[in-house]
Amino acid sequence: MNKELRAKTNEELIQLVTQLKGRLLEYRFKLAQGELDKTHIIKETRQTLARVLTILTERDVKVNVNAMVSSFVKEQTKQKEIQESVKKIKQLRVAKLKQNKEKRLANAEKVKAAPKPEQKTKKVKKAPKKTETVKPTTNKNKKNVKAKTKKKG
C-alpha cells in the first residue's frame, strides 16, 4: 500500500486526502445514526489518511486540507440544495395543478346546479285540418266495397 501511495503524484494524493476525509465524515455520520455495520472501516480510513498525509509532509507539500475538505463538502451541499429546490418547484407545480383542477370542478358543479333558463318556443301556426265528409254506408255501398276487395282467383 505504501509503495502504491508513494508512486502517486502530489495532486493525486491531495485528491485522495479530500476523498478520505469525506468518507470519514460520512462514516461518522452513519455510525451516529446506527446505519454503519462495519465500524472497522473508520479505523482503516484514518490509517490510510495518516499514511497519505505522512507522504505529503515528507515531500514538503503544504496542503490546507481543511479548506479542501470544506470546499468538497460545500459542493456536495450545493448539489443537494439544487436537488431539493427542484423537488420544491415540482411540488409547487403539482399543488397549483390540483388547485386549478378543484376550481374547474367547482365551477362545473355551479353551472350544473344553476337553474337553466327556459327556452322560448316559437308557436307554429297550424292549418286547421280538413274535415272529411263521411258518407253514410248503405247496404249497396257495402256490397260494392266488398266486391272491389275480393280477389279473383
Swiss-Prot record:
Region annotation (Disordered) ranges: 100-153
Biased segments, Basic residues type: 140-153
Molecular function GO terms recorded: structural constituent of ribosome
Gene Ontology BP annotations: translation
Region: Large ribosomal subunit protein uL29, residue numbers: 1-83
GO CC entries: cytosolic large ribosomal subunit
Chain intervals for the UniProt region annotation (Unknown): 84-153
Superkingdom, natural source: Bacteria
Keyword terms, alphabetized: Ribonucleoprotein, Ribosomal protein
Family under the similarity heading: Belongs to the universal ribosomal protein uL29 family.
Name used for this protein in its record: Large ribosomal subunit protein uL29
Organism whose genome encodes this protein: Mycoplasmoides gallisepticum (strain R(low / passage 15 / clone 2)) (Mycoplasma gallisepticum)
